Amino acid sequence: MKFAFLILGAFDEARDRAQIAGGAAQIVGVPDVEAACRQAQRLMDEGIGCIELCGAFGEAGARRVMQATG
């Protein structure tokens, strides 16, 4: 299974990202919840099956990302 980890902070979502194992594991830095929603949808479209969020999202932010990805 491919998975990703989204981290929230002073990041540039287009630049602050990394992957290992040929993209099977990815990490993406996002500046806000809206960017996290965009990136989560992109990751799912690319076949990521599990997205983990850092604790900085809080319950409300995590809920918004979950809603954005269905």
Question: PLM features: residue spans?
Answer:
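Active-site mouth loops of central-metabolism enzymes
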Residues: 21-34
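Non-catalytic positions within long, well-ordered alpha-helices that form the structural scaffold/packing
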Residues: 41-44
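Alpha-helix-loop-beta-strand connector modules within alpha/beta enzyme cores
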Residues: 59-70
